[in-house]
């Protein structure tokens, strides 16, 4: 067995789901009970000398997962270098680490992505475990302790708690069979989830006992499983010339500028506090897509794909805001994002996820949703979002130069979503994801909420519901005293406190998501290549956060409109509106004759006390309700 098989499986499972360059070290230590377990493992697998004599190791395996078959190859070199490449159906993934830097390719575009922040730390830790540094005489600088005993249907185990020498990383749990002394299971925390690898088919090969089969799965996501079966091993092969460092001869990415090389300016519709683009697939008519920095991959709605005969393959579980949902995959020959003047960009052979997103989102947005433009497209550019002008400008990172007056803020990249450091109420600090797919000011993640007991600090708390890729989720909304990001700050921000136990809102790596209710205050520039964010205050900068003044949300279903949600104690609730009721007219005008944007302004704009009428169908007859606007928070 080579531990890199475990790493490739976990990386593929998480990469398709979707701290600095020199972390400080901790002192090496091993407890006496743990030493007994490690010594027995070494004896069972061929001895300590056999392990340390493997200066380099090559492993090749057949892999199966997500509905695809593929191949995996890995090279590792003591003490801290690693390179692997995986093909799985239409996807290819490569990754490497030279001990100080690390990189991987985007599995959908093959773009080489240098790793930073927690991603770099995770890569270095994974290499440390692959090389079984914890079994060396000095534990490779790590910390090893006996956690206890466990039992399942297959046997009894001694469980070690193994911490790498890098601070800020949760330890892994290694399960050793009490009968054989062999390592049978590895549980690796990954943010709010765990990646579990089961090892089996142990055989003697090249002087050591090795597990020839591994099954890796993501806890609570049963569809995300990958099996690797080793078919070739070599010890001490030459690793000369392997790309442990990021390769510079990256493959062409299949993108072209449609009008002017290096820059494209696109019309961007800002509606319902979301960003909308026109996108054409394979030369077809323009369709409505969301532009979403919180999406790890570009997504096509499954209903749209079925109606247009787009073939799909594979399967996986993907995490949304408060839950998880299923996805398949498709390859699109050409995707063009362009305006009426022909300006824009086009991508060839783009691999996309296919998910059932339209039913949830279309009702909220009063328009059909064909898909979502995500990280795999967005990260190729320096993106400038001008909320006031309604434009999205895409720049080539190689030629872009910022010409404004604001100082750059350092972008934090953990995974595929950019983040900034921020502070709430002058004391609660964390990294916040910049999510232009959110209409909120700030959505605070469950672990951050619990750590700082923010539920008791909210003013005017209200229960609210929202929607993400995985479906609906519940939160609590209210105001805190202040929010600061770099030199920018606001009083009385509206925040949502998540109680999600799965999905993105259960993340421990981020304090929360910053959404468009805050970002619309700026002209926003995201420079992924150089890890910089520019915030240029605009006309909304000093506006106070205002919640809906009706306390209701109307859902559009093509041929009818329902009351999607009604907040308790809101003006809509006081007028008698009930969730789920059919709404047929507003101020006497048939509801389906209203444009969604015009209706939004009509229902929310104006001073407190302004009123309008809703006609609802109740008990088989129309009933007119009068709603008076009033600020709720």
Residue ranges and their predicted role:
Residues 29-30, 36-110, 145-148:
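N-terminal mature ectodomain segment of secretory-pathway/periplasmic proteins
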Residues 74-85, 95-98, 170-185, 229-242:
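A short, surface-exposed beta-strand/turn
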Residues 11-24:
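Bacterial N-terminal signal peptides
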Residues 63, 86-89, 106-108, 162-165, ...:
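Beta-turn initiation residues at beta-strand->coil junctions
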Residues 175-178, 200-633:
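Pepsin/retropepsin-fold aspartyl endopeptidases
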Residues 29-37, 43, 101-172, 178-182, ...:
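Flexible, processing/modification-adjacent segments and terminal tails
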Residues 68-72, 89-92, 167-172, 194-198, ...:
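Short, surface-exposed coil-to-beta transition loops
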Residues 52-60, 78-84, 153-161, 181-185, ...:
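Short, hydrophobic/aromatic-rich segments at coil-to-beta transitions
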